[in-house]
Amino acid sequence: MKKFISRPKRSSRRRKKTPIKPGENIDYKNVGLLRKFISEQGKILSKRITRLTSKQQRAMTKAIKSARILALLPFINNEN
């Protein structure tokens, strides 16, 4: 008689919700949204951390850089 080895069940992977709502536009003027994707030091967070798609990450990077040039966002956060 064969003995059956019980294997642990694999957990199903659920898609995590994207941090950007479908109606929200990635725009350099939307400073509140852009601040969510910048670290405390002022660096742009990676796609892996923010769970953005590649297309969204490119648009976010361009928007953050434009906002920095227009002095809407700081290049470096020096607040201690």
UniProtKB/Swiss-Prot annotation:
InterPro entries to which the protein is assigned, alphabetical: Ribosomal_bS18 (IPR001648), Ribosomal_bS18_CS (IPR018275), Ribosomal_bS18_sf (IPR036870)
GO molecular function, one term: small ribosomal subunit rRNA binding
Residue ranges of the region described as Disordered: 1-24
Pfam families in the cross-refs: Ribosomal_S18
GO-annotated cellular components: chloroplast; mitochondrial small ribosomal subunit
Superkingdom as given in the UniProt entry: Eukaryota
Family: Belongs to the bacterial ribosomal protein bS18 family.
Annotated protein name in UniProt: Small ribosomal subunit protein bS18c
